[in-house]
């Protein structure tokens, strides 16, 4: 009889293994809307379809390195530090086979995307203004966008401008208008001021009044 204690266990090769992809939702605000960056696919599968920047993990490559490589090669974006969002494991999300997607998210000021957007293969899509485009994204990317926007709203509910979407300095009105875009709903002015003002640092300066009465100017931090 074999001694089960000394018999070798199953090899890792005995288990089915999915491919692992990374897909990144790069979010910004443009023309009064939360937008996500899309790239036109050059690969044969879903050729020329708009999709989130994504790639398969290479052997011995970290997830973070794969994300940075993908953003650099497919979207012309570098110098960012996207964060992991969620693993999407629906088995039917990719008709080529079993693929796990480790989704990432990044919030980027519009000005930092200007160079990338010069490419015909890169565009912004309004999350609320172009619902058909978002819903039709391949590989379950619409679910990733929805989760990324949910995350964005959660972090902006707690902090003034964690994604540095506003140029500094700014007025409380500027900040509230940004938060209304992110939230997708109007916000009570006084409630917003009481909650956010302690999280800001005053500059001691006033706006020039070109958009109404002069107002105090603020920067992030407090």
PLM regions and their residue ranges:
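Long, intrinsically disordered, low-complexity Ser/Thr/Pro-rich regulatory/activation regions
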Residues: 200-222
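N-terminal strand-loop-strand
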Residues: 12-50
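Charge-enriched amphipathic alpha-helical scaffolds
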Residues: 186-204
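Short helix-coil junctions and helix-kink-helix linkers
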Residues: 177-186
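Short Pro/Gly-enriched beta-strand edge/turn motifs at strand-loop
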Residues: 2-10
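Short histidine-centered catalytic/ligand-binding loop motif
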Residues: 52-60, 164
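Active-site segment of metal-dependent pyrophosphate-handling enzymes
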Residues: 18-22, 35, 64-68, 72-123, ...
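NUDIX/MutT-family hydrolases
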Residues: 103-106, 114-156, 165-178, 191-197
């Amino acid at each position: 009889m074999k001694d089960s204690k000394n018999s070798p266990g199953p090899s890792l090769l005995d288990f089915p293994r999915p491919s692992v992809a990374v897909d990144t939702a790069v979010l910004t605000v443009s023309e009064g809307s939360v937008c996500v960056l899309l790239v036109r696919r050059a690969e044969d599968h879903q050729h020329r379809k708009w999709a989130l920047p994504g790639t398969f993990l290479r052997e011995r490559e970290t997830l973070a390195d794969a994300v940075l490589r993908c953003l650099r090669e497919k979207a012309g974006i570098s110098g960012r530090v996207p964060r992991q969002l969620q693993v999407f494991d629906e088995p039917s999300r990719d008709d080529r086979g079993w693929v796990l997607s480790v989704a990432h998210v990044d919030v980027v000021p519009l000005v930092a995307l200007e160079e990338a957007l010069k490419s015909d293969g890169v565009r912004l899509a309004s999350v609320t203004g172009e619902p058909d485009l978002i819903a039709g994204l391949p590989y379950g990317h619409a679910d990733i966008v929805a989760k990324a926007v949910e995350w964005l709203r959660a972090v902006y509910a707690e902090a003034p401008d964690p994604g540095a979407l506003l140029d500094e300095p700014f007025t409380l009105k500027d900040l509230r208008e940004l938060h209304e875009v992110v939230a997708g709903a109007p916000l009570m002015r006084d409630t917003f001021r009481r909650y956010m003002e302690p999280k800001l640092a005053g500059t001691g300066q006033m706006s020039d009044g070109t958009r109404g009465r002069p107002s105090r100017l603020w920067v992030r931090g407090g």
